[in-house]
């Protein structure tokens, strides 16, 4: 889990999904599992009661997820999308195109927070080596990516 002071960057959609999930956990699943525990207790001896043990395990899982989501929602920052025409500096939320200086491969991606990362759909974490290299830079700049095998890319588009 990230440090208390560390910002957790989320898209507006992810933020809404976390809010909805938290509400579902608190208002639906938590009461259900409490009822399951009550029913299992009524079956008598708790020392060999598989239903009771399963309900308690389920309760622990739900409570852990609630705690994790509450932490996220206590430390989030919504990624602002860049809509104006004067977009020039790469930041979290930017759509970026770079070209590898090694083999002229073009890479298109959006920089998102770690919880929204989806590399198969072109969304990379702001903590990834490529994102770290381009954040704060402008189109036209050449940057070195600090990866196990360092490489250079030229930023060709920021949007």
From Swiss-Prot:
The keyword Repressor does not apply. Keywords: Coiled coil, DNA-binding, Transcription, Transcription regulation. GO terms for molecular function: DNA binding; RNA polymerase binding. PROSITE patterns: GREAB_2 (PS00830). InterPro entries: GreA/GreB_C_sf (IPR036953), TF_GreA/GreB_CS (IPR018151), Tscrpt_elong_fac_GreA (IPR006359), Tscrpt_elong_fac_GreA/B (IPR028624), Tscrpt_elong_fac_GreA/B_C (IPR001437), Tscrpt_elong_fac_GreA/B_fam (IPR023459), Tscrpt_elong_fac_GreA/B_N (IPR022691), Tscrpt_elong_fac_GreA/B_N_sf (IPR036805). Residues 47-77 form a coiled coil. GO terms for biological process: DNA-templated transcription elongation; regulation of DNA-templated transcription elongation. It comes from the Bacteria. Belongs to the GreA/GreB family. Necessary for efficient RNA polymerase transcription elongation past template-encoded arresting sites. The arresting sites in DNA have the property of trapping a certain fraction of elongating RNA polymerases that pass through, resulting in locked ternary complexes. Cleavage of the nascent transcript by cleavage factors such as GreA or GreB allows the resumption of elongation from the new 3'terminus. GreA releases sequences of 2 to 3 nucleotides. PANTHER family: TRANSCRIPTION ELONGATION FACTOR GREA. This is Transcription elongation factor GreA. It comes from Metamycoplasma arthritidis (strain 158L3-1) (Mycoplasma arthritidis). The gene is greA.
